[in-house]
A protein has these predicted regions:
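H-loop/switch region of ABC-family ATPase nucleotide-binding domains
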Residues: 188-189
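Conserved ABC ATPase "signature" region
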Residues: 98, 109-124
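Helix-to-loop junction immediately C-terminal to a conserved catalytic motif
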Residues: 51
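Catalytic Walker B motif of ABC-type/P-loop ATPase nucleotide-binding domains
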Residues: 153-156
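The feature captures the beta-strand-to-loop junction immediately N-terminal to the Walker
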Residues: 36-38
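Conserved ABC transporter NBD signature motif
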Residues: 59-74
């Protein structure tokens, strides 16, 4: 089993509140891993530690064998949605992605347009983001996460604001990405409804992570 992400004894507190309580888990490469749990259960904090945005109090995080905070500061070739993307409302969806792509020389116009098309926003790419619905902004965030064609995707609540059809289309996109070798970690309140999508489902509860489903 090749590990995409490995966390060892991951512990994080804020003041007297211990949010992560010594989590150890391996997320296998090339699979879709669902993490469910209520608000405040620790899902987002774990994702931020994996992405290098938060430093754990104890423990370690490895992404494809490289230790975060020691070998590298942030995971390489990784697309992520950890918080609501801060898109500029007065320019179009395409212009927002083009602006963000300037930070990465690997992303050109072809990658931007392909990402927009894959999330079903092609007809709205010239529309100002301020006129987007919540679901459209969520899909634009997913387009941002995939436009580098990443090896790893980390997505916190990627189905927020999506209607049933939109969620289905996004799920189909995730399956397509997995088939091409992308590892996906996604958090939601209840991913048990998507057993068909996820290869494994873990539950985060009171700072502990437990596997509840595995194909």
């Amino acid at each position: 089993m090749k590990a995409a992400v490995k966390v060892k004894n991951l512990t994080k507190s804020f003041g007297k509140e211990k949010v992560l309580k010594g989590i150890s888990h391996t997320f296998e490469a090339g699979k879709i891993h669902g993490i469910m749990g209520f608000n405040g259960s620790g899902k987002t904090v774990m994702f931020k530690c994996i992405c290098g945005f938060l430093q754990p109090d104890r423990g370690s995080v490895y992404v494809y064998g490289k230790r975060i905070g020691k070998d590298i500061d942030f995971p390489e070739n990784t697309g992520m949605i950890i918080e609501s993307p801060g898109f500029l409302p007065y320019i179009s969806g395409y212009e927002n992605l083009k602006r963000l792509a300037q930070l990465n020389r690997k992303i050109g116009d072809t990658e931007i347009r392909d990402a927009i098309a894959r999330v079903g926003l092609d007809p709205f790419s010239k529309k100002k983001v301020g006129q987007y619905s919540l679901g459209m902004r969520e899909r634009l965030g997913i387009a941002q996460a995939i436009m580098e064609r990443p090896k790893l995707l980390i997505l916190d609540e990627p189905f927020n604001g999506l209607d049933k059809r939109g969620a289905q289309n996004v799920c189909e996109l995730f399956v397509e990405l997995k088939e091409k070798g992308t590892t996906i970690l996604l958090a939601a309140h209840n991913v048990m409804e998507m057993e068909w999508l996820c290869d494994t489902v873990c539950e985060m509860d009171a700072g502990q992570l437990e596997v509840v489903y595995e194909k």
